[in-house]
Curated annotation (Swiss-Prot):
Any Pfam family matching the protein: Ribosomal_S14
Key words, A-Z: Chloroplast, Plastid, Ribonucleoprotein, Ribosomal protein, RNA-binding, rRNA-binding
Gene Ontology cellular component annotations, sorted alphabetically: chloroplast; ribonucleoprotein complex; ribosome
InterPro entries: Ribosomal_uS14 (IPR001209), Ribosomal_uS14_bac/plastid (IPR023036), Ribosomal_uS14_CS (IPR018271)
Stated role: Binds 16S rRNA, required for the assembly of 30S particles.
Record's subunit section: Part of the 30S ribosomal subunit.
GO BP terms, alphabetized: translation
Chief site of localization: plastid
Compartment(s) where it occurs, according to its Swiss-Prot or TrEMBL record: Plastid, Chloroplast
Protein name: Small ribosomal subunit protein uS14c
SUPFAM superfamilies in the cross-refs: Glucocorticoid receptor-like (DNA-binding domain) (SSF57716)
Length: 100
């Protein structure tokens, strides 16, 4: 189980990313439309003004049961070992065990 503070920090980052998403997107569109390099640098400076944690690259997927940050399966939102336990217990419909 991940520490609760790390899970809360990740939730805070998600809220910030949603809050500043449109601002970042509009600034990036402006950069692509402006022909002169000096104006691009000015817009790039504005792009750096939102908080760092509002950048989408700082988000990290976590298992929604345990909060584990590694080995997550996007389709299920679970980490690998929790996914395996749930499949063995037949708690995930449509998921089958395989061996090769």
């Amino acid at each position: 189980m991940a520490r609760k503070s790390l899970i809360q920090r990740e939730k805070k980052r998600q809220k910030l990313e949603q809050k500043y998403h449109l601002i970042r997107q509009s600034l990036k569109n402006e950069i692509s439309k402006v022909p002169s390099l000096s104006e691009k640098w000015e817009i790039h400076g504005k792009l750096q003004s939102p908080p760092r944690n509002s950048a989408p690259t700082r988000l990290h997927r976590r298992c929604f049961l345990t909060g584990r940050p590694r080995a997550n399966y996007r389709d299920f939102g679970l980490s690998g070992h929790i996914l395996r336990e749930m499949v063995h217990a037949c708690l995930l419909p449509g998921a089958t065990r395989s061996s090769w």
